[in-house]
């Protein structure tokens, strides 16, 4: 275990509330395994204090930090630069220090992709169906485009929010790939997709016995399909349990969580990190 001393370098995660975060045990386990003199701390920051806090983090020479709810959008104007990936998603979850100030990116995109990249699929022939059109769905849309998928279908319950969701990409290459649908169109989409993704909070603890779709819809998936849930608690979710009973390959949100964290830690440390150690540390939290 790292012994904190006068030379310990600081990392952290900002959010409000922050008590639920699983990031400190995950990051500190990797830091300990690497034998580095760093520590990763939870930093509770209320929205009204964000601007003052970011200036303070700069003043104390914090090396970098993760950003969670509710600051992923609000922090953008406080940064000197953001990556194109963060601009497309419209949210920042990882920040690091540069000579010109704080720079931000979004590691959720590559975190989501990590378990998919190892699969032997021609992604250009896959037309993903994404359940939900909130902030998490934005990262998934960008990820699916980066993967080289065909049409990307986003299904939401609120029609008034679906059209603005698509129009937010009007001046990007993603616009022509993206189609938005109301929930009653879902049945017609499921039978043609090999990648069904839940980006909604439906099924998250403590409502672990809920699923965004029922077994009858999952029966329509082709045998080669993948069911991917961004939720990591409970493990597995009801959505994934149902998919598994039909022989569908499943991926849960823990893989996205650990991989997005590993990518962030590599940015801060400037070296490879032990992803397996981070995964093991996360599993101990359940």
Curated annotation (Swiss-Prot):
The active site is at residue 72. Shikimate binds at residues 21-23, 68, 93, 108, 232. It comes from the Bacteria. HAMAP family: Shikimate_DH_AroE. It is an enzyme of class 1 (oxidoreductase). This is Shikimate dehydrogenase (NADP(+)). GO terms for molecular function: NADP binding; shikimate 3-dehydrogenase (NADP+) activity. SUPFAM superfamilies: Aminoacid dehydrogenase-like, N-terminal domain, NAD(P)-binding Rossmann-fold domains. The gene is aroE. InterPro entries: Aminoacid_DH-like_N_sf, NAD(P)-bd_dom_sf, SDH_C, Shikimate_DH, Shikimate_DH-bd_N, Shikimate_DH_fam.
